[in-house]
């Protein structure tokens, strides 16, 4: 079989770096993580994403002590508790590059926040300069550490310290890591051949050709799995290994299942039994003595995002209900989605940032009928105005209606920070490992601006 290079083009949809980010954010949301440390944060694209506020308070955040709220979603098949928004309280980034950290300082600044998004929860942001093979006491016992597209850039003398420091000293509940799959590289050429181009192993240890000139290694599926299982056993963790990034095109030789995903991912969860805890305690003593030759990390910047002054302090339920009725009358609508009402002017402020309070108010108001939709998230539930519209405001106009009914979504329209495209790569970026995209609960790829562009992976294209 003879195929030219055009036939072997490989594309991903969504782009590979988006798929990595989606896996990461979905895992953080599923585990309800509130503290995230990004080692090798680069220019801070992940941190900038995490700085975006959730649209409402997390479950149990409201100061309303009505027991009705706590039981409101019992026995509901699908709600935001099943696929929650992220509610980070503290995020931090670590990197060795002053230049990259300068960019991260700008994109995580409260001054860069979108004023359209109300913030209902405070957030602390830290940026540290230092090598990842140096222990930072401020990161010990963090909840989650992430390392996306990082380890392949590390020399062997630094790589050997990653697991001992992260798993043995920092001891996060969750450690998430991604790295390119060398196994998948075969997808760019016919079996038994290798295209010219690419980047030869700079260490000379192998005859492999890598996706990026700065990569010190690229592991096969078996090599990555072996490394993950070894360090998980050594430090008392259980690991789940997988992959993301399947080519849109079918492989002419039927290798798709064998080659797997373009990016390898692993999720390490800490085990807290006596044996596992003992492993970490004993091992961390040796780690401290072996990594004290370099200077300590330097705190480059610390930001505090303040919550809205009304957060957790809702108004009277009747006042909230009347405000919602007013919106129905003003817009001339009889049925609205919960999200449509939530993003309407002062409604979230009256609710103190709690969507549970808003739903409670709708349940109790005689002119509002809450319509739960089985299998749908709360934002898609509907509220009907009982009796229909009885009046309209005198100053109503179609232009005003469109403006006031506009829904603010969590889809990010911020530009990517310093994103560069390298040959034979769909998103490996030194110092800026991924895009800046918030992962919402329901993502319609056909409607996300810019995501429909194919991410072409041409080995020789710059």
Enumerate the predicted regions with their spans.
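Class I SAM-dependent methyltransferase Rossmann-like catalytic core
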Residues: 2-30
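Conserved SAM-binding loop of SAM-dependent methyltransferases across substrates and taxa
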Residues: 43-86
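Hydrophobic adenine-recognition pocket in adenosine-nucleotide-binding enzymes
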Residues: 150-153
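A conserved beta-strand element that flanks and buttresses the S-adenosyl-L-methionine
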Residues: 146
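Conserved class I S-adenosyl-L-methionine
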Residues: 32-42
């Amino acid at each position: 079989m003879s195929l030219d290079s055009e036939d072997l083009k490989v594309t991903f949809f969504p782009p590979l770096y988006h798929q990595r980010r989606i896996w990461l954010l979905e895992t953080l949301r599923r585990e309800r993580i509130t503290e995230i440390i990004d080692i090798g944060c680069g220019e801070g694209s992940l941190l900038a994403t995490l700085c975006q506020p959730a649209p409402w308070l997390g479950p149990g955040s409201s100061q309303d002590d009505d027991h009705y709220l706590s039981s409101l979603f019992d026995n509901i098949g699908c709600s935001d508790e099943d696929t929650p928004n992220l509610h980070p309280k503290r995020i931090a980034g670590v990197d060795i590059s002053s230049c990259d950290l300068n960019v991260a300082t700008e994109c995580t600044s409260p001054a860069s926040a979108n004023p359209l998004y109300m913030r209902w929860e405070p957030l602390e942001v830290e940026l540290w300069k230092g090598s990842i093979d140096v222990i930072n006491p401020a990161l010990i016992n963090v909840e989650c550490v992430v390392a996306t597209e990082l380890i392949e850039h590390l020399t062997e003398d630094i790589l050997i310290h990653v697991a001992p420091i992260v798993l043995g000293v920092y001891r996060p509940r969750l450690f998430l890591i991604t790295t390119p799959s060398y196994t998948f590289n075969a997808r760019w050429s016919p079996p038994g051949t290798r295209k010219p181009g690419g980047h030869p192993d700079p260490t000379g240890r192998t005859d492999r050709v890598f996706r990026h000139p700065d990569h010190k290694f690229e592991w096969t599926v078996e090599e990555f799995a072996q490394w993950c299982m070894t360090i998980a056993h050594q430090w008392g963790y259980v690991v789940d290994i997988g992959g993301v990034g399947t080519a849109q095109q079918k492989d002419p030789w039927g290798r798709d299942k064998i080659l797997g995903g373009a990016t390898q991912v692993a999720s390490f969860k800490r085990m807290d039994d006596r044996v596992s805890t003992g492993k970490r305690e004993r091992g961390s003593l040796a780690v401290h003595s072996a990594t004290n030759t370099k200077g300590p990390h330097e705190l480059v910047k610390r930001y505090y995002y303040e919550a809205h002054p009304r957060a957790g302090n809702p108004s009277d339920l009747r006042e909230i209900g009347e405000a919602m009725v007013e919106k129905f009358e003003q817009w001339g609508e009889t049925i609205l989605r919960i999200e449509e009402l939530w993003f309407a002017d002062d409604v979230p402020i009256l609710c103190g940032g709690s969507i549970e309070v808003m739903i409670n108010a709708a349940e109790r108001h005689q002119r509002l009928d809450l319509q739960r939709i089985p299998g749908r998230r709360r934002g898609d539930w509907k509220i009907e105005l009982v009796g229909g519209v009885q009046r309209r405001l005198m100053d109503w106009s179609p232009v005003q209606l469109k403006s006031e009914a506009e829904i603010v979504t969590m889809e990010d329209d911020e530009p990517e920070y310093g994103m560069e495209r390298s040959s034979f790569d769909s998103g490996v970026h030194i110092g800026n490992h991924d895009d800046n995209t918030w992962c919402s609960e329901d993502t319609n790829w056909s409607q996300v601006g810019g995501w429909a562009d194919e991410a072409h992976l041409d080995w020789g294209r710059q």
